[in-house]
Amino acid sequence: EVISTGYVGAPRGRKNCSDLGYCIRQQLNIPRGERYELCRSVHAEANAIISAEREKMIDSTLYLVGKEVGTGAYIEKSSSCSMCKRQIINAGIARVFIRDSRNEYRMVEVQDWIENDESLEFKNDDLIRASFVKFSSY
């Protein structure tokens, strides 16, 4: 059962880079996998999680495929960015299948992302900021 789908694109009502005719990350020569906070899009993983029912995501499988916009070629060795990994963990998703080519796939156990916490590589307290969001109804 498919419980949700997601795509990479600008937030609702905003223009995509392809509509604007430029990408700020490309203009700044930012390598793939870095500085996604500068990207104007919402990643496919995040869009899928936003659209899904929480109960159905518990112990689910996420299928991820990335293609180059210009060529349509599969993005080999693709991986979720650190922000999407955190969202996948909190959503309760158990595994991620990543398509590397027409016939090649990898499976990642989300538990591995939990046990091998890449965010601990940062030691500088100045890089760490705590944010809290409170939701309330009126």
Model-assigned labels for residue ranges:
Residues 1-138:
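Zinc-dependent deaminase catalytic domain
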